[in-house]
Swiss-Prot record:
InterPro entries membership: P-loop_NTPase (IPR027417), RecF/RecN/SMC_N (IPR003395), SMC (IPR024704), SMC3_ABC_euk (IPR041741), SMC_hinge (IPR010935), SMC_hinge_sf (IPR036277)
Free-text domain note: The flexible SMC hinge domain, which separates the large intramolecular coiled coil regions, allows the heterotypic interaction with the corresponding domain of SMC3, forming a V-shaped heterodimer. The two heads of the heterodimer are then connected by different ends of the cleavable RAD21 protein, forming a ring structure.
Similarity annotation: Belongs to the SMC family. SMC3 subfamily.
Chain positions found as N6-acetyllysine: K113, K114
UniProt PTM comment: Acetylation at Lys-113 and Lys-114 by ESCO1 is important for genome stability and S phase sister chromatid cohesion.
Lineage: Eukaryota, Metazoa, Chordata, Craniata, Vertebrata
Oligomeric and partner information: Forms a heterodimer with SMC1 in cohesin complex. The cohesin complex is composed of the SMC1 and SMC3 heterodimer attached via their SMC hinge domain, RAD21 which link them, and one STAG protein (STAG1 or STAG2), which interacts with RAD21.
Source species: Xenopus laevis (African clawed frog)
Subcellular location: Nucleus; Chromosome; Chromosome, Centromere
Gene3D superfamilies recorded: 1.10.287.1490, 1.20.1060.20, 3.30.70.1620, P-loop containing nucleotide triphosphate hydrolases
Pfam families reported in the protein's UniProt record: SMC_hinge (PF06470), SMC_N (PF02463)
Name of the protein in question: Structural maintenance of chromosomes protein 3
Binding sites annotated in the UniProt record for ATP: G32, R33, N34, G35, S36, G37, K38, S39
């Protein structure tokens, strides 16, 4: 075992967490400048392992925390990790960590991260070989010097610590304390013995007079016994007579009470039947009111449906007439439209011909006019231009403008032509779309009709189910009334049971149920729920005849809770307390009940109570524990005999009980308050209630739930159908709207078609004129410039004038004819579009609407609904009439029961009067019996007060009469008066004091033996202490000589035990002799001296005070090594032990450490190079910014530290 690693944080100069690299198991050297933190590192290890830092005050703990710049350190810890591969520490781990944590208010130890106490740590270290009496496995700075300068007495003290004499001293102190206590007790006993001797002498004189007194007193007591015994016998005879009368009266009272109980039971049964009938009547009346409300509501619905049906029928008849009228009007409109279309067909060709001629004439007129204009312009250009070139230039310019204008005209004509073509194409598409929409409209109308029909079918089915549900609701309400009555009955029974049971017990039962319900709700502790079996009373049954005796036997144990195991009860109680629930609970854990088989007597007068109980054999232990040692007996006499003979509890059927301990209990027991009977009634009502609830849940509520589900499904279907209806109707409206829009587009297109055609003709005529002008200008280009037209041009102008006049005349005629034909066409088209066709559309729409209504779907659905409501009205009326009959019968039955109730009440009253009379008689007998019992008790008390009597006293005066007895008693009392001054307790006191004397003498002897044992123990302890010191001195002395010779070759050193005489005035060497005594005392030792010679010569042996400082240090080191060899530790910590040594001795110390390091670990600090030579691992401590750091370094770096400690500072 050795220190493997040290971790420091916040301790003194080590602020940050410092994890020291693992140490070697042999020799480790730590080097560093003064003040760098080497000693603090040693303090850290000592802080964990040594007793020096055990009891720290808060200010001392704060002093150990790091103080420097930066945040304030509030806690520190030092952790040492041991290599435990040799299992020196009794922990089955190869590495063991020990940490100590301190703060302003805490000081804790952790062993392998588990908190432990300081004592645990110290005991663990002692088990690993760390002795409290030898703390020299850690040698701090200055310890060597302290030992070198210590006096002899200090070294003796050290030797005693190493020898472990502290234990002997502690035992000796305990023995001295015990001896003082024994001396005190011995003195007290001596005082008591002296007092008792004096008192016994006085009592010896009083004994003679006491003998005469006792003679007459014995006679008096015998006479008094005889008198009291005669009175007692007379009283017993009278009591027996009264007891016989009471038994007779009791039997009669039992018969009367049984008859009264029968009457009460009958009354309760009748009362229950009356309550049930009243509840039934109330339910039926309530149902009747509901039926009446339903019937009124149904009649209202029927009236509405009848009116709706009539309206639909009237509407259907009116629609038929309207349809005929509309069809007739439609036919007339079609004929008129056909007539107008025919007229239009005749007029339009004429109009087209006239219009074509007109347009041709207009075009020709424009062409001729333009040609004439061009010729006139040609004539005018002779005066307009001065030369041919100027004219040609102008013509070219005009031609360019004309070309551009002609191109514009052509583009306009092409655009209009394209527009007209698109209009034709759109017209065809419009017609196709219109036809398709018309087909879609018919399909949508068909689908709407189908949905309407389906909707009314689903609605009728839903109404039927609602009617059925109403009936089931009424049935459920009736069952609920019965349930309410049962619950009320159950509550009354439970209230009676609660009144007969303690509140704390009932609260306990309720609290246990809450705990179990909490477990169920959380889904936890299922084994606890399964392991709880309820209270005793709920787990067995028996015949009613045994209720009284069973209940008296069990008492409150009827409410004990049976559980599978103590674990179950513990879990329940933990949650019980956690939830802070009220009540009192007692558990019977089956696994902990120790029940033995009982041998029952074989007799016809008694039976084991447990044989009359019916229960699950799984709970046999619990029932044997409660009832196993009780017999049911025929009578009280039998109970008394068997209880004495078999040491068993016995009880009669009436509840009179005889305990095996002798106690008798009994009296009248009111069976009306029997908790078993009440519990049986509660369970019976609970079973009936559960049956009703099951019937309600399984039949009615299940059917209601099924119908509700079906109604919900139908409602969903209706909603889906309504959604589809809205969807299709919206689609229909959308189609109609689209058809209307297409029709309007077609009409608009037709309106714009003719103006576009006229515009096209005008553009073509204008284009033709422009082209003619362009040709004329082209022909003129390059010709001679003339001021007059040529003959040919003049002729052409004249011809054009004639043609223009003729064309103007023809155009005027064609215009008049066209306007006339156009007016006719416009009038006919307007009549067709604005009148006939619009009206035809209206008629068609009205016919479509009529077709939708004529489908008869609404009327059919309404008729079916009317038939269904009529059936429901009829069924409701029949049910209401049936209820009237049932209510009348039930009320008659209830009245009969009330009359029967009155008869039983009278019977119960008669029985009660008889019981009261019998009770009064019984009360008189009881008072008389009480007086006799009191007299009996007085006689027995007086007999008991007489004390023990001789046998002759029971028979000597039996023949005398009471008069003779009283005369003799008077004579005795007269004689006794003479000895009134006698100490009547003299004899008792004499005996008592004699016994006390014997006890005190025995106690005195015991104390003497104890005193002797203590003295012997103290001598043994003193001897052992002496032997331990002697043995330790020899071992240390031997080791010291050997170590010194190794450190100083050729040198010699010895330890000398110094003694003194008894008075301490003289001393001598150990070798010269010792004080002769039976038990040698260690007090004779005054110190341990040291004599050394560095040359080995006996003549040069010197004392410590004669040595130089370095020699003293070397001798002190030799002593420390000697002590360590005597009591070895697994590792050693030396802080600058070579400080005062010269180089030669430092080398010797280094060699010594190297030798010892093969068996133990050494961690040393030094400023000298000699110790580095024997080291296996090196560590350097640096101090920067007031914080220490420790790291592994090489041997060369360690030597640098030692040779020049400023290099790495």
């Amino acid at each position: 075992m050795y220190i493997k690693q040290v971790i420091i944080q916040g301790f003194r100069s080590y602020r940050d967490q410092t994890i020291v690299d693992p140490f070697s198991s042999k020799h480790n050297v730590i080097v560093g400048r003064n003040g760098s933190g080497k000693s603090n590192f040693f303090y850290a290890i000592q802080f964990v392992l040594s007793d020096e830092f055990s009891h720290l005050r808060p200010e001392q703990r704060l002093a150990l925390l790091h103080e420097g710049t930066g945040p304030r350190v509030i806690s520190a810890f030092v952790e040492i990790i041991f290599d435990n591969s040799d299992n020196r520490l009794p922990i089955d781990k190869e590495e063991v960590s020990l940490r100590r944590v301190i703060g302003a208010k805490k000081d804790q130890y952790f062993l392998d991260k588990k908190m432990v106490t300081k004592n645990d740590v110290m005991n663990l270290l002692e088990s690993a070989g760390f002795s409290r009496s030898n703390p020299y496995y850690i040698v701090k700075q200055g310890k060597i010097n302290q030992m070198a300068t210590a006096p002899d007495s200090q070294r003796l003290k050290l030797l005693r610590e190493v020898a472990g004499t502290r234990v002997y001293d502690e035992r000796k102190e305990e023995s001295i304390s015990l001896m003082k206590e024994t001396e005190g007790k011995r003195d007290k006993i001596n005082e008591l013995l002296k007092y008792i001797e004096e008192r016994l002498h006085t009592l010896e004189e009083e004994k003679e007079e006491l003998a005469q007194y006792q003679k007459w007193d014995k006679m008096r007591r015998a006479l008094e016994y005889t008198i009291y015994n005669q009175e007692l016998n007379e009283t017993r005879a009278k009591l027996d007579e009264l007891s016989s009368k009471r038994e007779t009266s009791g039997e009669k009272s039992r018969q009367l009470r049984d008859a009264q109980q029968d009457a009460r039971d009958k009354m309760e049964e009748i009362e229950r039947q009356v309550r049930e009938l009243k509840s039934k009547i109330s339910a039926m009346k309530e149902e009747k009111e509901q039926l009446s409300s339903e019937r009124q509501e149904q009649i209202k619905q029927r009236t509405k449906l009848e009116l709706k049906t009539k309206d639909l029928q009237d509407e259907l008849a009116g629609n038929s007439e309207q349809r005929k009228r509309l069809l007739k009007e439609r036919q007339k409109l079609l004929e008129k439209i056909e007539e107008k279309q025919k007229e239009l067909a005749e007029t339009e060709p004429k109009f087209s011909s006239v219009k074509q001629k007109e347009e041709s004439g207009i075009a020709r007129l424009a062409q001729a006019t333009q040609e004439r204009t061009d010729l006139y312009a040609k004539q005018g250009r002779g005066s307009q231009f001065t030369s041919k070139e100027e004219r040609d230039k102008w013509i070219k310019k005009e031609l360019k403008s004309l070309d551009q204008a002609i191109n514009d005209k052509k583009r306009q004509i092409a655009a209009i032509n394209k527009d007209l073509e698109e209009t034709e194409v759109n017209k065809e598409k419009n017609l196709e779309q219109y036809t398709k929409l018309d087909q879609d409209l018919n399909e949508v109308k068909t689908r709407v009709e189908e949905l309407d029909k389906k909707y009314y079918e689903v609605k009728n089915k839903k109404d039927e189910l609602q009617s059925e549900r109403n009936y089931l609701w009424r049935e459920e309400n009736a069952e609920q009334q019965s349930l309410a009555a049962k619950r009320e009955d159950l509550e009354k029974k439970q209230q009676l049971l609660r009144a007969a049971t303690g509140k704390a017990i009932l609260n306990g039962i309720d609290s246990i149920n809450k705990v179990l319900e909490h477990f169920r709700r959380k889904g936890i502790n299922q084994h606890v729920i399964n392991g709880y079996h309820g209270i005793v009373m709920n787990n067995f049954d028996c015949e009613p005849a045994f209720y009284t005796c069973v209940e008296v036997t069990a008492g409150n144990r009827l409410f004990y809770h049976i559980v599978e195991s103590d674990e179950v009860s513990t879990k329940i109680l933990m949650e019980f307390n956690k939830m802070n629930l009220p009540g009192e609970v007692t558990f019977l854990p089956l696994n902990k009940l120790d029940v033995r088989d009982t041998a029952y007597p074989e007799t016809n007068d008694a039976i084991p109570m447990i044989s009359k109980l019916r229960y699950n054999l799984r709970f046999d232990k619990a029932f044997k524990h409660v009832f196993g040692k009780t017999l049911i007996c025929r009578s009280m006499e039998v109970s008394t005999q068997l209880a004495r003979a078999f040491t068993m509890d016995c009880i009669t059927l009436e509840g009179d009980q005889v305990s095996h301990r002798g106690a008798l209990t009994g009296g009248y027991y009111d069976t009306r308050k029997s908790r078993l009977e009440l519990q049986k009634d509660v369970r019976k009502v609970e079973d009936e209630l559960h049956a009703l609830e099951a019937k309600l849940n399984e039949n009615l509520r299940r059917n209601i739930e099924r119908i509700n589900n079906e109604i919900d499904q139908l409602m969903n279907q209706m909603q889906q159908i309504e959604t589809q209806q809205r969807k299709f109707k919206a689609s229909r409206d959308s189609i109609l709207s689209e058809m209307k829009m297409l029709k309007e587009k077609r009409q608009q297109s037709e309106k714009t078609f003719m103006p576009k055609q006229r515009s096209l003709q005008s553009l073509e005529a204008s284009l033709h004129a422009m082209e003619s002008t362009r040709e004329s200008l082209k022909a003129e280009l390059g010709t001679d410039l003339l001021s007059q037209l040529s003959l040919e041009d003049q002729k052409r102008v004249d011809a054009l004038n004639d043609e223009i006049r003729q064309l103007q005349q023809e155009n005027r005629q064609l215009l008049n004819e066209r306007i006339k034909l156009e007016g006719t066409i416009t009038r006919v088209e307007t009549y067709l579009n604005e009148n006939l066709r619009k009206r035809l559309d209206q008629v068609e729409q009205e016919l479509n609407e009529l077709r939708e209504t004529e489908g008869g779907t609404v009327l059919t659905a309404t008729t079916s609904e009317l038939e269904a409501i009529n059936k429901r009205v009829k069924d409701t009326l029949a049910r209401s009439e049936g209820l009237d009959i049932t209510i009348d019968k039930t009320e008659v039955e209830s009245k009969d029961l009330v009359k029967s109730m009155d008869r039983w009440k009278n019977m119960e009253k008669d029985h009660m009067d008889a019981i009261n009379h019998d009770t009064k008689e019984l009360e008189k007998m009881t008072n008389r019996q009480g007086m006799l019992l009191k007299k009996k008790e007085e006689c027995m008390k007086k007999i008991r007060e007489l004390g023990s009597l001789p046998q002759e006293a029971f028979e000597k005066y039996q023949t005398l009469s009471l008069k003779q007895l009283f005369r003799k008693l008077e004579q005795c009392n007269t004689e006794l008066k003479k000895y009134s001054h006698v100490n009547k307790k003299a004899l008792d006191q004499f005996v008592n004091f004699s016994e006390q004397k014997e006890k005190l003498i025995k106690r005195q002897e015991e104390l003497d033996r104890g005193h002797k044992s203590i003295m012997e123990l103290m001598n043994v302890l003193e001897l052992r202490k002496y032997e331990a010191i002697q043995l330790t001195f020899k071992q240390v002395s031997k080791n010291f000589s050997e170590v010194f010779q190794k450190l100083v070759p050729g040198g010699k050193a010895t330890l000398v035990m110094k003694k003194g005489d008894v008075e301490g005035s003289q001393s001598q060497d150990e070798g010269e002799g010792s004080t002769q005594s039976s038990v040698p005392s260690v007090d004779q030792f005054t110190g341990v001296g040291i004599r050394v010679s560095f040359t080995g010569k006996q003549a040069e042996m010197r004392e410590m005070q004669q040595l130089s400082g370095g020699q003293k240090s070397l001798v002190a080191l030799a002593l420390i090594f000697a002590i360590q060899k005597c009591d070895p530790a697994p590792f050693y910590l030396f802080d600058e032990i070579d400080q005062a040594l010269d180089a030669q001795h430092r080398k010797a110390v280094s060699d010594m450490i190297m030798e010892l390091a093969s068996h133990a670990q050494f961690i040393t600090t030094t400023f000298r190079p000699e110790l580095l030579e024997s080291a296996d691992k090196f560590y350097g401590v640096k101090f920067r910014n007031k914080v220490s750091h420790i790291d592994v370094i090489t041997a060369e770096q360690a030597k640098d530290f030692v040779e020049d400690d400023t290099t790495h500072g």
